Curated annotation (Swiss-Prot):
This is Cdc42 effector protein 1. InterPro entries: Cdc42_effect-like, Cdc42_Effector_BORG/CEP, CRIB_dom. Residues 237-270 are annotated as: 2 X 7 AA tandem repeats of [PT]-[AT]-A-[ENT]-[PT]-[PTS]-[AG]. It comes from Rattus norvegicus (Rat). Pfam families: BORG_CEP (PF14957), PBD (PF00786).
Amino acid sequence: MPGPQGGTGAPSMSLGKLSPVGWVPSSHGKRRLTADMISPPLGDFRHTMHVGRGGDVFGDTSFLSNHGGRSGNTHRSPRSFLARKLQQVRRVGVPPRRMASPAATSPAPPPISPIIKNAISLPQLNQATYDSLVVSKLSFDSTPASSTDGRSGYGLESGFCTISRLPRVEKHSSRDRDHDRDPDHSQDREQSSSPSEPNPNPELRRSDSLLSFRFDLDLGPSLLSELLGVMSLSEAPAANPPAPAANPAPTAKPPADAVTTLDTVTSLPAPTASSPSSGRFPNGVTAVLGPVAEVKASPVGEGPQVPSKMAFDRRGASWGAIRASRHYTEMDARRELAGVLPQVHGSWESLNEEWSAPPASSRAPVPSTVQANAFEFADADEDDEVKV
């Protein structure tokens, strides 16, 4: 006799073939993880434990704390374990106090993320193996002292690898500076301290701290400094011009009213035969006879004085009195210099000999008056330009 389902022809479904996940109640219809979905620990970080947002905790969570998680039995009480963990997370900045239970083998961990410990202790995650790994790889100055105020401490006691904070690094640097300044005092202090006294502040050595690395990079002198050095060297000769070797300073300088340019003196032409009759005085000044202008001799060490009517004006291009009515040409300037300044013979050496002070015995007396050429000027209609 066919069953009630045989008449409809629908295939029969056995309840034994259904997955147990389908019978798990869910408020939102989502699949929740169960203990049988988690494989046993295989030594891999990804399959060791699981903590869900909804409070699902599976696997070995003994590395988090010895007070809550237990290997193999953690999934039995996920709610109580998660509640304790959430309470520790909410109290950020306040380290959890030690529990008075005698079964506690180690203090509660500090309020830091346990993932740091997981990343360091891969692939072993149990507490005993981690402690041995930390002892073998990291060397501490001394064993941590037991906390007397009921708070947990860092370092080897809590099973967490901590890095020196900034105040500790500053304390190290200050100690090093004090040691460099006064090595004898620090040595006496170390000898006076008892070797059996534990260090109240356990911390890693400077070589093990990540903050102790220093990178000194020397790039050498900059390009700007080299350019400034070259510019300073090029400006130094310009600032201090060398003294002219071929232009000695005369002992007797003519006054400012007279022309003292030696280059102009060297280009002076010798008096020609067509010029008026002239005579030569012992001091080398050539006097031309003709319309004369009186020049008074000055004391020793000064040049001949020119009358005020023949003095240069501000522009120095002509004589003040005569320039108003006549043009002043280059030939007039040469004739003027030929009458006032001594003639140059030979080279610069001969000029130096003439200007240098001769001995007192061989020095000729200077006449009281010297007649110079009364300068001849061109007509007023001459179109030559005045050369300054």
